[in-house]
């Protein structure tokens, strides 16, 4: 009976951080696109097309519902559509519900996010919008088997006890006698890439003093690890007519720290304008800075054109500044699976005035082959590909933090890159909170020891100074000599 009373539903609280559009739909994600119209790269919302008169011709979050097919009256759908769903007529005399992005089902009766609470465990259910091909996991427990999500018919489910998977237990919250249990899951819409458009689902179960599960929709705070951004290197071929710069939006200084979703840009200016007058980026790849088999690589630009992944990550098209000249690639900060580091490799071609090979080509080109994972003997962070006389290979590294997670910033351990570890900035080694606390404790201990030692020394000196020499009153003084007679034998 008590188990039955304890069962209830808890509200999933969403932290969408940089997500300006709906948390469930964002056309900037690789698995969510606009059916018609265009995607606004800033808001993540679809801009639906209009008819000849300037009126919208489509509606719904993905602009997938033609207004001409919306049923009128809405009661033609029987049973009626729920939760803001719209009744429409896909074919003659056939009526269906088009759901909003947060619900699904024939009547839009099911929320995509749902949490079940019982007396000893929590179950998180999430039904992504179809074509989802990403990854869902409990924060800080991505590789913990008992915390893993399983998928069945599009539904992702994870069940674990309140003592597992980092569940935070708070007593006497929200009221005296209550117990609150809270945990968070990350929804990555691309299994290899972490972006500001990803979601953080926070579920909270509240068991009150009477043993009933209560709904809770309070949104907590998100702590940000305020560590400095670590831009490491610019590695060029022998001749350096161009450079690779990571900048903030509109060429502003990089934000500190760099968080997922921050607006950044790659700026590649032509430094040698005496010999060359034009440049073109032919390839741009990125990896997570780790050694095989943990290395993840993605190609953003191939043969001068954006790939599908590049289209999702790059804001707008590849642009240029002919006055410099320079290549400009705007993007929102992201990172790849397994590491906060994002290492870029750009292949840039430079041309003289009469050379036409730097002129923009027609896109798209065929998709690039799948990236080849390096063998352990290779050094992916330092490898240089062959380049022709008028090609330059540039490298740059960025560290991106996730403000929605309490993770600690750890650089990936790459055994083959010992030199970079030896040359690490000593100041970065002190940026760990635990190390700083230990240093402070040691300093305080040393100061206390010095104070105690000083006090003991002063006390000892005073005691010696206060000693008084006691003389016998019968003992002669001055220069008199005391003679002791010898015994007669």
Curated annotation (Swiss-Prot):
State the tissue distribution. Component of the acid-insoluble organic matrix of calcified layers of the shell (at protein level).
Disulfide linkages recorded for this protein, renumbered to the chain, are: 77-87, 81-97, 99-108
Query: In what residue span(s) does the EGF-like domain sit?
Result: 73-109
The terms describing its cellular component in GO are: extracellular region
Q: Which InterPro entries match?
A: Cuticlin, EGF-like_dom, ZP_dom
Composition bias, Pro residues: 363-374
Which residues get glycosylated?
229, 414, 479
The UniProt keyword set, sorted, is: Disulfide bond, EGF-like domain, Glycoprotein, Secreted, Signal
Q: Where in the cell is it found?
A: Secreted
- What name goes with this protein? EGF-like domain-containing protein 2
Say which species the protein is native to.
Answer: Lottia gigantea (Giant owl limpet)
What's the source species' lineage? Eukaryota, Metazoa, Spiralia, Lophotrochozoa, Mollusca
């Amino acid at each position: 009976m008590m188990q039955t009373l304890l069962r209830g539903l808890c509200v999933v609280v969403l932290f969408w951080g940089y997500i300006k559009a709906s948390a469930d739909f964002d056309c900037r994600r690789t698995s969510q696109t606009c059916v018609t119209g265009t995607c606004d790269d800033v808001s993540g919302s679809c801009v639906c097309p209009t008819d000849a008169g300037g009126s919208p011709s489509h509606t719904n979050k993905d602009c997938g519902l033609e207004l001409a097919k919306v049923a009128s009256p809405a009661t033609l759908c029987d049973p009626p559509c729920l939760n803001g769903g719209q009744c429409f007529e896909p074919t003659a005399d056939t009526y269906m519900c088009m759901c909003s992005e947060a619900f699904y089902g024939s009547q839009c009766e099911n929320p995509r996010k749902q949490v079940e609470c019982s007396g000893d465990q929590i179950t998180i259910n999430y039904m992504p919008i179809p074509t989802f091909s990403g990854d869902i996991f409990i924060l800080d427990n991505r590789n913990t088997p008992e915390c893993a999500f399983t998928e069945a018919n599009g539904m992702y489910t994870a069940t674990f006890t309140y003592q597992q998977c980092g569940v935070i237990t708070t007593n006497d919250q929200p009221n005296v006698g209550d117990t609150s249990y809270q945990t968070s899951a990350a929804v990555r819409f691309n299994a290899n890439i972490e972006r500001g458009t990803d979601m953080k689902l926070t579920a909270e179960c509240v068991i009150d003093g009477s043993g009933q599960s209560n709904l809770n929709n309070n949104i907590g705070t998100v702590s940000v690890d305020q560590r400095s951004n670590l831009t490491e290197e610019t590695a060029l071929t022998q001749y350096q007519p161009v450079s690779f710069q990571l900048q903030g939006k509109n060429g502003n200084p990089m934000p500190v720290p760099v968080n997922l979703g921050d607006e950044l840009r790659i700026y590649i200016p032509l430094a040698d304008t005496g010999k060359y007058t034009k440049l073109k980026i032919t390839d741009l790849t990125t990896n997570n800075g780790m050694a095989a088999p943990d290395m993840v690589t993605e190609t953003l630009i191939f043969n001068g054109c954006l790939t599908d992944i590049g289209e999702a990550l790059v804001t707008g098209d590849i642009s240029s500044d002919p006055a410099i000249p320079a290549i400009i690639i705007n993007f929102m900060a992201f990172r790849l699976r397994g590491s906060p580091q994002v290492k870029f490799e750009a292949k840039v071609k430079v041309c003289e005035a009469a050379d036409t090979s730097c002129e923009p080509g027609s896109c798209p080109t065929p998709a690039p082959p799948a990236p080849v994972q390096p063998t352990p003997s290779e050094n992916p962070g330092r490898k240089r590909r062959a380049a022709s006389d008028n090609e330059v290979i540039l490298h740059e590294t960025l560290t991106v933090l996730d403000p929605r997670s309490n993770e600690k910033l750890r650089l990936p351990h790459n055994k083959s890159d010992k030199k970079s570890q030896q040359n690490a900035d000593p100041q970065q080694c002190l940026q760990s909170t635990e190390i700083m606390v230990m240093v402070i404790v040691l300093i305080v201990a040393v100061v206390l020891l010095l104070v105690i030692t000083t006090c003991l020394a002063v006390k000892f000196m005073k005691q010696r100074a206060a000693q008084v020499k006691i003389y016998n009153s019968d003992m002669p003084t001055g220069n008199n000599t005391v003679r002791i007679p010898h015994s007669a034998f």
